[in-house]
């Protein structure tokens, strides 16, 4: 299910397609234990998951789990093994994982991915081609144009907010929309009536939780 491979990209944790995330996390822990003292705390690895898009919402939990085990994920690779040879990877794209706290005081550029298990606050812009994967809510004090996936741990109570919400994609828990907010109007995206709605700050009406 999981294994570490030495490749041209360096050391890669390869996770095959799976059905149960808890089984994957347990398998990662077991594999690292089997490897004894191979890793030092803070070692950086790459991560590749088969059927990346299917499992994208699990990435914050996987990255957080690896961090708790002392490993930092430097980049996420999208691709496949070549000719069944697991040590030869065909990489279609790669995104940099920002090892950061929940408060980011800069722009997030194209090709960068921010992964955090809780809320993420950005004092800057989220450019096209950038991505945020957050366990909680995401608030951008700037223009948001990239992909933002929120509520991956906390569920549909999470929100996505920005001073200018022009995202390519918003995901909150299991809900996805490609809609945008009104240009240059501070807006909040939240789940209401089993779908994501985007409303101006001054007109937002949240659905009451039971």
From Swiss-Prot:
Keyword Cell division part of the UniProt annotation: yes
SUPFAM superfamilies on file: Cell-division inhibitor MinC, C-terminal domain (SSF63848), Cell-division inhibitor MinC, N-terminal domain (SSF64043)
Key words of the record: Cell cycle, Cell division, Septation
One of the Pfam families matching this protein, by short name: MinC_N
BP-aspect Gene Ontology terms: cell morphogenesis; division septum assembly; regulation of cell division; regulation of cell septum assembly
Similarity comment: Belongs to the MinC family.
Quaternary state and interactors: Interacts with MinD and FtsZ.
Role: Cell division inhibitor that blocks the formation of polar Z ring septums. Rapidly oscillates between the poles of the cell to destabilize FtsZ filaments that have formed before they mature into polar Z rings. Prevents FtsZ polymerization.
The name this protein goes by in its record: Probable septum site-determining protein MinC
Source organism per UniProt: Thermotoga petrophila (strain ATCC BAA-488 / DSM 13995 / JCM 10881 / RKU-1)
